[in-house]
């Protein structure tokens, strides 16, 4: 992400979480995520690592502000069927060490009931700190881009695409795992795209995972 996007209005997306990850190899990686309750952040399973620190209330991730809340992750709940080869079931919940303080710049993003299935043609927005062009590195400031939900055949050239589990969108680029918003509700999580950032791209379909999400939240 976020190719062809524009900078978000600072703090207009108070649910956004910036993830700093120490990988199993000991290197740093970065992802986006979003706060779904005071204690939990949702992101992609491909963002898992040895240790994760979440920053809430951020716009430019290199310019510290008084709005920031930095909280360590105490537990990573990777979907039990996540497959790093097919990139199916690319969803993870992060339990925070302490509850986030809800403020004007830190808030939660509602998840819809499970029955919600959005039709192709709908315009949505992807939000995150991803790449702004193929040649650029990640963006320091939060970006967003409008994307159209495509008919499933547009993603059939991805061998592991499954319409029930995933959404086929116009393109975003890698490095993100932020939310896909349709009518201000989280419908997807950025999962993968072509290496050259040509459309389309694949998002995890949140509605399919509601039973698992509800179970994790209830038990923890």
Swiss-Prot record:
Q: What is this protein called?
A: Chymase
Cystine pairs:
31-47, 124-182, 155-168
List the SMART domains hit by this protein, alphabetically: Tryp_SPc
One Pfam family cited in the UniProt record for this chain: Trypsin
Which purpose does this protein serve, as stated in its record? Major secreted protease of mast cells with suspected roles in vasoactive peptide generation, extracellular matrix degradation, and regulation of gland secretion.
Q: Which domain of life is it from?
A: Eukaryota
Q: Which residues form a coiled coil?
A: none
The EC number on file is: 3.4.21.39
Report the GO terms under cellular component. Answer: cytoplasm; extracellular space; intracellular membrane-bounded organelle
Positions annotated with a glycan in the UniProt record: 101
Share an example GO biological-process annotation for this protein.
proteolysis
The family database entries (InterPro entries) matched by this protein are listed as: Peptidase_S1_PA (IPR009003), Peptidase_S1_PA_chymotrypsin (IPR043504), Peptidase_S1A (IPR001314), Trypsin_dom (IPR001254), TRYPSIN_HIS (IPR018114)
Ranges for domain Peptidase S1 come to: 2-218
Q: Which compartments does it reside in?
A: Secreted; Cytoplasmic granule
Catalytic activity entry: Preferential cleavage: Phe-|-Xaa > Tyr-|-Xaa > Trp-|-Xaa > Leu-|-Xaa
Q: What main location does UniProt list?
A: secreted
Q: Which UniProt keywords apply?
A: Disulfide bond, Glycoprotein, Hydrolase, Protease, Secreted, Serine protease
What would you give as a GO molecular function for this chain, any one?
Answer: serine-type endopeptidase activity
Say which family it is in: Belongs to the peptidase S1 family. Granzyme subfamily.
Catalytic site: 46, 90, 177
Q: What class of enzyme is it?
A: hydrolase
Organism, scientific name: Oryctolagus cuniculus (Rabbit)
